Amino acid sequence: MEFAGGSLRLGAERGEERFIFDNEKWGHDVELAPFAISAFPVTNAQFRDYADDGGAPPRYWKKMDGEWRERRFDRWQPLEPDAPVRHIDWNEGQAWCRWAGRRLPSEAEWTCAAGAMHWGEVWEWTASTFAPFPGFSADPYADYSQPWFGTHKVLKGASFATPCRLMNNAFRNFYMAERGDVFAGFRTCRMDP
């Protein structure tokens, strides 16, 4: 999906009738260059091709009788080829992107495209480091966001396990780059020409 770029309002707006975390405050304008983003997250089949070409498989995959299987709770099940790959850490997403000649989207690019793309099956890694928005002020529980600025990566979207009240494209999830236990996957952008 191609986007022309331009100005984007990133973050929550005052007066929204939902719970807003301190790291979503407040909406501010960012400028985006034109970009192209995948309509869907990277699938098991796409990641399987990478693993078959020598890339590291996800931690919950194992080859059995010549076929990749995925651990789901206490069972090894055949991969669903069209399902988004999950339990991928940020570094694994970056490695796949290098292999495929793609890149992770920025938080702003993902947010810009959110209204036009399918999301909500897995949290999606972005290229963006978790940082405060301009004018950030910690909520009374200061340890929710502030200690993690600069050391975590932003994930956008939601997973099947996300409560409905948190499912909106302004929500900013964040984890350390090596966390692969999260229901996380990724989508990609075309490399800039």
Predicted regions span which residues?
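Active-site microenvironments of metalloenzymes and redox enzymes
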Residues: 31, 35-113, 190
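Surface-exposed recognition segments
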Residues: 22-28, 52-60, 117-193
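Extended, Lys/Arg-enriched charged tracts that mediate electrostatic binding to polyanionic substrates
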Residues: 1-6, 10-11
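Short hydrophobic-aromatic micro-motifs
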Residues: 8-9, 37-38, 123-125
